[in-house]
Regions:
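Terminal "cap-and-tail" regions of soluble proteins that handle hydrophobic small molecules
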Residues: 27-76, 80-82, 92-93, 97-351
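Generic detector of short alpha-helix boundary/capping microenvironments
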Residues: 6, 14-15, 71, 277
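Bacterial N-terminal signal peptides that target proteins for export
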Residues: 1-12, 21
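C-terminal segment of classical bacterial N-terminal signal peptides
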Residues: 17-25
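A short alpha-helix/helix-coil micro-patch that ends at or immediately precedes a cysteine
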Residues: 86-89
Length: 351
């Protein structure tokens, strides 16, 4: 069972957690106010820690045992505009240190976009025995059969043949998604059949911040390719994340950057998982980038991130306590990611 190996080193694309939305009554330039935009109350100790430049991370409650939700906040000693210039350099910003592979998709997607995609030897080999309800790779049953009919698993070029099929299918996924949106997201038959679009809809429905403070982004993710907000920037990309003791996670995601006119001084950056070959049925990450505007003090920026992963299976308790280990790993990963991002942003901001 894949989920038995989910451990603290897990890193991949992510989620926004559904805490109740709280209306802002605090000073706009405070750490508490930035967190309240996400429905998270910081106590005085946490607020003071953020102002000192420390990263604050919390694990949040979820409605489904398979979901993991993590919240983090940090203050950057750079302006919002300076930080957003870094973020909107998608090719560099999205290619994080944990990623062993990455590429942006052209519009329309072309073969060169996926020329660096390589299916691992283990994944390629295991497809030989895949069947509906029992497969180590997340695929529709029709694609399991296609691979088995087109690949000679006794040949020496199994990995390259499976990789060629995967590259073509990724281009098809992107083209279909651009034309038809969520309705074209894959059906996963590695376990009992489920639609990736249904899992994502469940995650999106719990995103109180995105739905109430940035409803245009929520609606865009729900109705894409319709309803594109004016001024939004978006990109589709693939990534492969290396995870110790786990199979490499190959995924396709849709990222957007948007400054809602109804939320002064804040830009929203969100990422939606379209496909992942292991572990995740759905993932969503929402980051808000807000001005810290305090009279007499240097300009700074609050970055608040909320992530959710919906796993295919995440048992809790017992000797293994898979859920507990996954939660701890994702919490630690959030802290590491935010500390690294703070260091990189402030280093670039001083140039």
């Amino acid at each position: 069972m894949q989920s038995r190996h989910i451990v603290a080193r897990l890193s991949c694309a992510a989620f926004f957690a559904g805490a109740p939305f709280v209306q802002l009554n605090a000073q706009t330039g405070s750490a508490a106010a930035a967190a309240l935009r996400h429905g998270i109350r910081l106590d005085d100790v946490e607020s003071a820690a953020v102002e000192r430049g420390e990263v604050i991370v919390r694990v949040l409650p979820t409605q489904d045992q398979r979901d993991v939700a993590v919240f983090g906040v940090v203050r950057l000693a750079v302006t919002r505009d300076a930080y957003l210039r870094r973020v909107q350099d998608f090719r560099n910003w999205l290619h994080t240190p944990t990623r062993t592979g990455f590429g942006l998709f052209s519009d329309p997607a072309v073969a060169a976009d996926v020329e660096n995609v390589v299916v691992s030897r283990d994944d390629a080999k295991d497809l030989r025995n895949c069947r509906a309800g029992d497969c180590t790779t997340k695929l529709p049953a029709t694609e399991m059969l296609r691979v088995q009919s087109e690949v000679d698993f006794s040949a020496r070029d199994v990995q390259s043949r499976v990789t060629a099929i995967a590259r073509l299918r990724m281009l098809q996924y992107v083209g279909e998604y651009r034309d038809h949106g969520n309705a074209s997201m894959p059906v996963y038959d590695d376990r009992p059949s489920m639609r990736a679009s249904d899992a994502f809809a469940a995650v999106l429905a719990q995103s109180a911040y995105l739905n109430q403070a940035a409803p245009a982004v929520s609606a865009y993710f729900r109705t894409f390719p319709r309803g594109r907000p004016a001024g939004i920037s978006d990109v589709l990309y693939w990534s492969e994340d290396a995870v110790a003791r786990l199979r490499p996670i190959l995924s396709i995601s849709h990222a957007v950057v948007y400054t809602p006119p109804e939320v002064a001084g804040t830009t929203v950056v969100a990422s939606k998982q379209i496909y992942a070959n292991h572990y995740f049925e759905a993932a969503l990450e929402v980051m808000s980038v807000s001005d810290r505007d305090v009279s007499g003090e240097p300009a700074a920026t609050y970055v608040v991130i909320e992530r959710r992963f919906r796993f295919d299976n995440l048992p809790k308790g017992g000797i293994l306590n898979i859920r507990g280990r996954a939660v701890n790993g994702l919490r630690d990963q959030m802290r590491d990611d935010m500390q690294r991002e703070k260091s990189a942003a402030e280093r670039l901001g001083t140039r």
